[in-house]
Amino acid sequence: MALEEKERIIIPDENGDEHLFEVLFTFDVDETEQSYIAVVPAEQAEEEEVEVYAFRFEEQENEDFTLFPIESDDEWQMVEEMLNTLAEEEEA
């Protein structure tokens, strides 16, 4: 999903502290009917190496969504392939 303006979301950490993230992209996997999101910290400087966080998510009726950690190797492989594809497209 290409975003014209960076979408931002707030994600609490394990201590309840909230952190602002920019959404890189979201994608759906038809076979599993799962949705995934990749984000980076919003306050990260441009020249720094970017740390990407990925989650599986489920949308709620009120336009909120719930994040779930990615736990299987297969899911991580799918997310990494999408990141690599995105990086290749940006370099082209």
Curated annotation (Swiss-Prot):
Pfam families associated with the record: DUF1292
InterPro entries in the record: UPF0473
Protein name: UPF0473 protein OB2006
Family assignment from sequence similarity: Belongs to the UPF0473 family.
Recorded superkingdom: Bacteria
Spans through the membrane: none
PANTHER family assigned: UPF0473 PROTEIN CBO2561/CLC_2432, UPF0473 PROTEIN CBO2561_CLC_2432
HAMAP family registered for this protein in UniProt: UPF0473 (MF_01448)
